[in-house]
């Protein structure tokens, strides 16, 4: 049976977590609640949230943070283009560029994919050195190596001098007539994400589209890919209930190196 002291301790921890949550959230988000059809500005350019149903509470990111997200994307795009490494937007970032024609104004990280053939380089010291030269850095979760992944295998990138925003890059592999996102790996093989498994022609060829003043690499059939991952209503309903990625990263910063 739980005693009074345990209840007090749990209550204190919950209050402390709530205070930390609000403090961290204020670094990156405004108190402006996202509403369908609302307008906002980034460097005097006007944007408009799609006028469709919204589920959950989303809050507008700070303008300076949205500028940093854009800068991180452009810096990484130019880096990988120079290295002749193909990457493309995925997940919530792809959803943003297709549905909003820009980054979603409440999504605080960038999601990317690349082929498994690039994994060795991205786990190398050379990769870290090359990023350093252009003002970027790579972070890898504790326990994650080129040979073994136990939780959401991938790398994380950010601009030097900033804890956030971050870019997560996950690996995919061609398997027969399909391309599969790799969830984890070990010496026995790869584990795949069933929701992110596509016929070759849905993903390939990757297309460079000019969206919101940027060249954005997207899948061949992005609408079909979004339907497979998010369901038939991805362009009819906006879901905003997930906790900020920035908060989790700030609190768990010690597990990345």
Residue spans for each PLM region:
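Structural signal for hydrophobic/aromatic residues that build the beta-strand cores
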Residues: 109-112, 213
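Helical scaffold of the NTase/Pol beta-like nucleotidyltransferase catalytic core
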Residues: 29-90
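Terminal accessory/targeting
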Residues: 11-14, 29-33, 237-239, 243
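Active-site nucleotide-donor binding segment shared across nucleotidyl transfer reactions
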Residues: 77-110, 117-120
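Terminal signal-anchor or tail-anchor transmembrane helices
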Residues: 3-25
């Amino acid at each position: 049976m739980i005693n009074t002291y345990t209840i007090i301790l749990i209550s204190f921890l919950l209050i402390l977590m709530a205070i930390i949550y609000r403090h961290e959230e204020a670094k990156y988000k405004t108190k402006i609640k996202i509403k369908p059809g609302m307008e906002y500005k980034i460097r005097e350019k006007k944007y408009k949230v799609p006028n469709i149903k919204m589920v959950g509470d989303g809050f507008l990111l700070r303008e300076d943070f949205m500028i940093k997200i854009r800068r991180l994307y452009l810096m990484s795009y130019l880096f990988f283009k120079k290295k002749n490494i193909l990457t493309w937007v995925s997940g919530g970032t792809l959803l943003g560029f297709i549905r909003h024609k820009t980054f979603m104004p409440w999504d605080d990280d960038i999601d990317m994919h690349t082929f498994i053939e690039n994994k060795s380089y991205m786990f190398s010291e050379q990769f870290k050195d090359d990023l350093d030269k252009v003002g970027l850095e790579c972070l890898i979760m504790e326990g994650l190596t080129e040979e073994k992944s136990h939780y959401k295998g991938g790398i994380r990138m950010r601009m030097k001098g900033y804890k956030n925003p971050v870019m997560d890059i996950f690996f995919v592999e061609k398997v027969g007539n399909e391309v599969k996102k790799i969830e984890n790996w070990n010496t026995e093989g790869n584990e795949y994400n069933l929701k992110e498994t596509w016929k070759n022609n849905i993903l390939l060829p990757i297309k460079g589209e000019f969206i919101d003043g940027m060249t954005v690499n997207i899948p061949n059939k992005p609408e079909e890919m979004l339907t497979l991952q998010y369901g038939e209503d991805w362009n009819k309903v906006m879901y905003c209930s997930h906790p900020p990625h920035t908060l989790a990263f700030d609190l768990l910063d010690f597990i990345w190196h």
